[in-house]
Amino acid sequence: MKQIVIASRESKLALWQTNYVKDRIQQELNIRCQINTMKTQGDIILDKPLNKIGGKALFMKELEIAMLNNKADIAVHSLKDVPYQLPQGFCLSSFMPREDPRDAFVSNKYSSIDDLPRGAIVGTSSLRRKAQLLHYRYDLEIRDLRGNVQTRLSKLDNGDYDAIILASAGLIRLELNERITQFIPVEISLPAVGQGIVVIEALDKSSEILQKLQKLNCSDSFCVATAERAFNQELKGGCHVAIGAYAELHDNQITLTAMVASSDGKNILKRKLTGDDPMRLGKLLAQEMIELGAYKILEK
């Protein structure tokens, strides 16, 4: 194999992720790479929340079409943007080492969530973040915030918001660590499924590519991601519901913490389970939470 063409979105963060994968393929597999950038519907439609326009798949469809049309061999994604069910014919071939999975509190005026005054305006379009923030601080005003990292930071700097919530991983990768005012504890805001993990998507019939890319796979990331995604799949969660899940691996034991919440944050259910089989663990925890009324909470 002489070359691999990688499909990527055009944002700085997407290109950082793609170049990271490109460098690893070239250095570790000794295969030349070319990047094919493109805009997705998720990048173009910025005036509506994701849950109103079709969900996370809007960040992937154009990249998948490029693979089907032989204009790319693989695509690179942030795992938190990947739906629990891929279109037929596609698979996730490699999981990269996880960056800090926590949410980041970013503000020019306040040092932490606790420091925000009553009625402060916080920007996020994530139902998961909104629900958990309102559960912790019901007196805050949450307003939608879409766009790439730089666009969101500009809106904060222009005074549109008192604070915004972003993924720490994205800020760290873009060397914008100094913008992080507070790493939000997972006890306050449980991360999105797969947050902090970069993945490679490929056609499942591309056996030669899949075999080579397997060498890049981080087994720890694959393990925790499998648990989190199994939980999400059992609940059939997407960006239209407030669901969070975070798995930690210690001595071959996985501890999975998960939560579901009503969109207003008034009702929240959080549980934790430990086991050694990630797929089974995710399903068991989801089933336990369903029995405790998870679906009723998500419908509110």
Curated annotation (Swiss-Prot):
The modification S-(dipyrrolylmethanemethyl)cysteine is found at residue 239. SUPFAM superfamilies: Periplasmic binding protein-like II, Porphobilinogen deaminase (hydroxymethylbilane synthase), C-terminal domain. It comes from the Bacteria. GO terms for molecular function: hydroxymethylbilane synthase activity. One of its GO terms (biological process) is protoporphyrinogen IX biosynthetic process. InterPro entries: HemC, Porphobilin_deaminase_cofac_BS, Porphobilin_deaminase_N, Porphobilinogen_deaminase_C, Porphobilinogen_deaminase_C_sf. Its EC number is 2.5.1.61. The porphobilinogen subunits are added to the dipyrromethane group. HAMAP family: Porphobil_deam. Tetrapolymerization of the monopyrrole PBG into the hydroxymethylbilane pre-uroporphyrinogen in several discrete steps. Monomer. This is Porphobilinogen deaminase.
